[in-house]
């Protein structure tokens, strides 16, 4: 198999990969019963599921307070204590925009909020029309210079019970602790359980062919480290799983960003989903606690609302960092991302880091590349003998196959030697694709010149055109034995097809492919010179 056919193989693999990933994002089937059994024991739906917020609609916001830290700006509704707006201070809404990115919002036609409350026999959050109206000491709270932690207590009293709902935010963190403290002076026992869920409009946001994205639910249990549960899944079947030993979380994820509730109860919780109208919920329900009169009890959960930063998320909850979904080649993509981040810390530019990573990857793969070209050169040297063999043997395929294998063995040629290195390189490309696609660090990161955002396509298509030209040069430098007119036309058209595809790829990925092609040209020149000295190649 010569280099021209290898390029065809790469093209077919790339197109297949693009079509597969688009299908994989769109087709996210609900877990079967056996999967549910593996990920946690099935429990009845929470008792409050039918009467909590029975009617879809926008949450009433008679009064909200503003909470500001170095990385977050939140709006919290004093009715119920829901987080109804979350601005990420370090992330712009669009490239070169002064507006910050809004992850949680409560707007007509687009609701995405984080709700929490107390339910159970004496619950105070059993209905959307009857939730507690908390008292707060101020309308705004700001994490001051030199202050590492900000606590916002909200108080409510009813029927001899004192409730304090406290939000705890820390400097540099997107994790928010939500704590309930209940003091029972009612003269009777009181039973409560805490719930916390994310509510979002059911929507379809599949991205493009070259950059498909997922927007929907995801969860983790003790037995299932990470699993998506799309809005379609929620509409098909309500999920109800047991989170044993206090492990697990429920999340809503999208490209680059995620929100998640992590229960902080060692006794275990119930993970649930449901759809009400056009609103989808995914959340956790912690077990009830009975508080004797004169006693007090506390409930706690952590809300993550921010970018997909793997190190921080891993520190908040086990497996939460897996929302950075590298696909089935995660074991390759994750080390590549780690290496890329390490290089970026040295060169302080993500574009330069991609270039350095390309040289490292292609350097590590040089033995495979050399073996590939050497094998192809030997195969070309055998072409006259193979042609004569076909003329001598005719249509006897079995004899032809036997004599070909004897010839390969005699000449010490592996007929797959030119193909296998290419197949081994494809997982690297696919893994790097996901590493770049899932890296929020590359979002709106500039390179040089006209490349002002490595996560967006080249605005002037210069990199894709250069990439196509480099492919054309590789073709011209590669000897070929292809004589079939149709194959020749396909190979001639291949750089054009690749260029078209890469017009819509993020410029960071096109940069990798362009530099990889340049390295290929350099390696190709060096290998051909060495093969010429051995008589295996001629100009």
Curated annotation (Swiss-Prot):
Swiss-Prot/TrEMBL keywords:
Cell inner membrane, Cell membrane, Chaperone, Membrane, Protein transport, Transmembrane, Transmembrane helix, Transport
Biological process (GO), any one = protein insertion into membrane
Kindly give the CDD domains that the UniProt entry links to this protein.
Answer: 5TM_YidC_Alb3, EcYidC-like_peri
Subcellular locations according to the entry: Cell inner membrane
Compositional bias, Polar residues, is annotated for 35-44
Which residues lie within the region annotated Disordered?
A: 35-55
- Give the domain of life: Bacteria
Give GO terms: molecular function aspect only: membrane insertase activity
GO cellular component terms, A-Z: plasma membrane
**Where mainly found?**
membrane
* Coiled-coil region(s): none
- Membrane-crossing ranges are 6-26, 341-361, 416-436, 454-474, 495-515
* Cleaved signal peptide residues: none
- Indicate yes or no for the key word Metal-binding: no
What does the record say about its membrane topology?
Multi-pass membrane protein
Q: How does it assemble?
A: Interacts with the Sec translocase complex via SecD. Specifically interacts with transmembrane segments of nascent integral membrane proteins during membrane integration.
* Stated role: Required for the insertion and/or proper folding and/or complex formation of integral membrane proteins into the membrane. Involved in integration of membrane proteins that insert both dependently and independently of the Sec translocase complex, as well as at least some lipoproteins. Aids folding of multispanning membrane proteins.
Which PANTHER family does the entry mention? Answer: CYTOCHROME C OXIDASE ASSEMBLY PROTEIN COX18, MITOCHONDRIAL, OXA1
Record-stated family:
Belongs to the OXA1/ALB3/YidC family. Type 1 subfamily.
Name of the protein in its database record: Membrane protein insertase YidC
* Protein species of origin: Vibrio atlanticus (strain LGP32) (Vibrio splendidus (strain Mel32))
